[in-house]
Amino acid sequence: MTTFTTPTRHTDRVAGLHYAEAPVRQRAVLTCGSWRRVTRRIVCGLTCALTVSSLLMPSVSFAAEWVKVDGSTYTAGATAGDGSTWAWDGADNMTLNGYNGGGIAAGGKLNVSYEGNNTVANDEGNSISVENVTSEGAELNISGTGTLTATAEGDALYSAGDMTISGTGAVNVTGDANGIYADNDLSINTSGTVTANGTHAEGIRAGGDITVTGGGTVDTRSEQDCGIVAEETLTVSNSTLTAQGFGIGIYAFDGLTIDAATVRAYAYPAREDSPTAIYTDEGDITIKNGSLVHAYAEGENAAGISSYNIYPGGSGGRIFISDSTVEAIAHYINRDNGNQPLPPICYSDFVVVEPDATARTFGIFALTEDGLTPATISITRSHVTAEGNTAAILAVVNSADGSISGTIDIVDSIIETPDGGRICDVHFVDNETDDILHQRGQTIGTASDVITDLYSDAIAKRAVIVPVDTPPAKPESKPKVTTAAATIKHVNAKDTLA
């Protein structure tokens, strides 16, 4: 039996220095563990309290009450600046043009517009941050055409409310805590680039929804935690997102939608292992409209793409892939650099050997509890490659009697690998605990009967599913049109990081 860990919701963090919290040990399950969010109810209570208090605040929009630039504080109503590299209009708007100095903070709303090359560094706190004040809630909006570089002992970019990053420029941030952190929603709507690195916490984190749109490129990583975390939903559309982290690459608590986008996610061993490249609980994973997805997880009990749900009234445990190309790989690889196994996110002097076939890993995995919507993996007109030491693709339901089953649906597509591959029923029983646990569902394999052994050779360790040919257009004399199966180059973990 194996326990799994999760990044926890930051329910009582204050503006300023944000550091990773200790993981919470979770309940063990037979095939893949849960990342139960034990603080969710606390968050809901705090949210309700904040909502009530917000109703008592004026609905009129006010200017920022103050700003602090490189150690000096300026109050609203009077303009400020150094005459060349930065200027504040005394309200909500600040411009940067060639700024090279210390941290920038504001009470309330702050719109930062940048051009030219700008550097903001703070070795005692956050680089650019906004906090709530009496007259106005925090809101940070950053837009520009040049380059904005921010480094911080705390969070590089922080908002106690919402945050928006837009424009055509390049935003490059590194925080000793988080790279980018918003207490509420985060919107990245840019045709430029955003690079966010978190040393001790996440590369990007939001307490609400995260949306990535605009056709730009977002690259985020963490050296000790998740690459990107949305405590509500994450939506990536018509853009490119690359996320690399320890434990989890992409974590969307309440659901993930990838729409006509390119997403690459990498997860490496952390804490007690069980890394997952793309993960949701209480929310489904939807990949559609020509999206290209590469998910790679390395470590024992790893999963490339996984959705899980044990909460009554919630969704999750369902993965929908349509008209897209997906590669989900999970392996345990022994890395020997003379000390202990270490992933390449921090080290370059390692040796890669063949995956250890004895470790338990899954390419695409869905799991729900009895009484909830059954686990489902649906693949429609898509090219899917999945690899796992234990199972390439698996959908199961936990129950006390085995009466409910997870399902795999393949529509307008065929199983190309393994030879003779089909959708197989599985029924695993755990008799090692006082409460007998049944797990019923489906996998890709070669058996004609129900598979009862999780480690059966009849379970495909590699599965390739491809779209069927499109029917010829009429009239019949026109050439036959086939669906082109886009491909994603499989990138070895050694080459994923600069």
What positions do the PLM features span?
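Intrinsically disordered, low-complexity repeat and linker tracts
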Residues: 3-39, 60-62, 432, 437, ...
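Alpha-helical transmembrane segments
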Residues: 38-49
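C-terminal segment of classical bacterial N-terminal signal peptides
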Residues: 46, 52-61
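A composition-driven surface/loop motif
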Residues: 62-472, 488
